From Swiss-Prot:
This is Charged multivesicular body protein 2a. GO terms for cellular component: ESCRT III complex; late endosome membrane; multivesicular body; nuclear envelope. A motif (MIT-interacting motif) lies at residues 208-218. Residues 211-220 have a biased composition (Basic and acidic residues). Keywords: Coiled coil, Cytoplasm, Endosome, Membrane, Protein transport, Transport. Signal peptide: none annotated. The keyword Lipid metabolism does not apply. InterPro entries: Snf7_fam. Belongs to the SNF7 family. The gene is chmp2a. One of its GO terms (biological process) is protein transport. Residues 12-53, 198-219 form a coiled coil. Residues 196-220 are annotated as: Disordered.
Length: 220
């Protein structure tokens, strides 16, 4: 059928065809208007020439031709303006048609997405996701508890070592203060011998104090 009667033109093709016809008509009107304007200039020149020669009858006839020519020029201008307005309307229709086609494509895409997005399946997926997330959180919490239990003794030992070190540091400062009160080696041997028992007693007291603090820490 298309071979016999020709292929049916689409709206876009018809719009382009009409647009070309209107543009061609406007170009022809412009050419005719330019010819009339040239003729108008020639008539004006002839009128001036005849007026100088005193041929007033010819001047009157040419004046009528001039008026008629100017009217035609005005009509051509108005006609071209009307054709241009129609051309703009066709362009607007073409733009609207393009917009409609775009909206049609978007509508089809949205319809396809709506058909593919099945709410029951999505709800089922979300419920399963929440379930698996809760299971993962529980497993993570259990693993953290197990790790804390395994590492707890080491943490306690580290804290105990830190406390013992702090106590030893404090006792070291005390022992240093006690030893600073002892006489220097430059003193007499008899005095040093006399103070030896006192220094030994001081060290014994310091050791006893250290042992008592360690016992208290173990009980705590």
């Amino acid at each position: 059928m298309e071979f016999l009667f020709g292929r049916r033109k689409t709206p876009e093709e018809l719009l382009r065809q009409n647009q070309r016809a209107l543009n061609r008509a406007m170009r022809e009107l412009d050419r005719e208007r330019q010819k009339l304007e040239q003729q108008e200039k020639k008539i004006i020149a002839d009128i001036k020439k005849m007026a100088k020669q005193g041929q007033m009858d010819a001047v009157k006839i040419m004046a009528k031709d001039l008026v008629r020519t100017r009217r035609y020029v005005k009509k051509f201008i108005m006609m071209r303006a009307n054709i241009q307005a129609v051309s703009l309307k066709i362009q607007t229709l073409k733009s609207n048609n393009s917009m409609a086609q775009a909206m049609k494509g978007v509508t089809k895409a949205m319809a396809t997405m709506n058909r593919q997005l099945k709410l029951p399946q999505i709800q089922k997926i979300m419920m399963e996701f929440e379930k698996q997330s809760e299971i993962m959180d529980m497993k993570e919490e259990m693993m953290n508890d197990a790790i804390d239990d395994a590492m707890g003794d080491e943490d306690d030992e580290e804290e105990s070592d830190a406390v013992v070190s702090q106590v030893l540091d404090e006792l070291g400062l005390t022992l240093t203060d006690e030893l600073s009160n002892l006489p220097s080696t430059g003193g007499s041997l008899s005095v040093a011998g006399a103070k030896k028992g006192e220094a030994t007693a001081a060290l014994a007291d310091a050791d006893a104090d250290l042992e008592e603090r360690l016992n208290n820490l173990r009980r705590d």
